[in-house]
Amino acid sequence: MKNRILLINLGGPRDTSEIEKFLIDLFEDPLVFDLPLPEWIRKPLGKWVAKKRAPKVAQTYKSMGFGGGSPLVSETSKQANAIAKALEKITGEKWEGNITMTCGYPDIRKLNRDFLVPTKQNILLPLYPHFSRSTVLSTAKLVEQTTKFCPVSYEGWVAPFHSSQVYLESIRDLILDFFQNRLNRKDFLHSDSFQGVSNWETIDLIFSAHGIPIRLIEKGDRYREEINSNVENLKRLLYEKGFRGKCHTSFQSRVGPSKWTEPNTITMLEQLGKNGVKRVAVYPISFVSDHLETLEEIGEQLKKIAYNNGIAEYHRIPAPGIYPKFIEAMAKIGLESIQSSKNECICKKLGGHFPNLKSGECPINF
């Protein structure tokens, strides 16, 4: 059997024709579109919301300059190839990099079972640094539908990696390389504006994460806790390298009227401007590749809000993508997942209350 690593991401439409499929997969997922409704109401409602949002979303994707779609799938493919090469360099063996998406194409539901069974020679890497029911648990459940067993207790399954030292150091170095204009622009999208940051040691740094509904936190989701821990660790590493600016944590991409994790990044920028802050850099801490939420939301929408609130200097730090130190970190984290067997179902430890669970049952089925 050949060595393989499978990168799993949420997904994004590659062109206009895939937008509706992407949104339907997103809003039909009970762990993403998590509402206190009977399934016979929730699922059709999710499909209706997807169809209603599709035209507006299409206009946003059209403005990004990627043929009416998202670059996320192609960027993930670049990461898979780069990580496979890094694994070959570390192990001296041949590795094959593959990708699949939980929403849209390539569809995880259509993938051959052999690719979804985690083993020492078949690493499954969900590209989420932090746990959330709507990402990691949703991914595990989709894998289980094909394999017929919960994958997270098996060697070869990569758990959320926000606390990994090699990951943390790679993100610290990415931020510092951006500040000091040392990034290879060919490795990043929309990089023409990368000019470095003068007096970077004192700029205000916002770690902006994708928000989630508070109802998920109330169910035991550890996402917010892990974001905060990630920020604290990065602050420590940055301060050790001479950074002295203030660090802030906020959440973006809210959808709908329900209460989400706070503070919202919009509110954060408004407050910083009100307080007289003139220089801000934003890093997308919950994302590992650039796409709609980083290029359009952080790069354009939030920049306008910053300028409208008196902030004179605004920088979008890119997601890691194929940044070499990040790629090497992901390869090492992947190998760590096969070096010791967990031999237990760890779904409960990943967060979430499951009141209907019987003793010994895996919550992935709920």
Swiss-Prot record:
Fe cation binds at H210, E293. The keyword Iron applies. It is found in: Cytoplasm. It comes from the Bacteria. Pfam families: Ferrochelatase (PF00762). Keywords: Cytoplasm, Heme biosynthesis, Iron, Lyase, Metal-binding, Porphyrin biosynthesis. CDD domains: Ferrochelatase_C, Ferrochelatase_N. GO terms for molecular function: ferrochelatase activity; metal ion binding. Its main location: cytoplasm. InterPro entries: Ferrochelatase, Ferrochelatase_AS, Ferrochelatase_C, Ferrochelatase_N. The keyword Metal-binding applies. One of its GO terms (biological process) is heme biosynthetic process. Its EC number is 4.98.1.1. It is an enzyme of class 4 (lyase). It catalyses: heme b + 2 H(+) = protoporphyrin IX + Fe(2+). Pathway: Porphyrin-containing compound metabolism; protoheme biosynthesis; protoheme from protoporphyrin-IX: step 1/1. One of its GO terms (cellular component) is cytoplasm. Catalyzes the ferrous insertion into protoporphyrin IX. HAMAP family: Ferrochelatase. Belongs to the ferrochelatase family. This is Ferrochelatase. It comes from Leptospira borgpetersenii serovar Hardjo-bovis (strain L550).
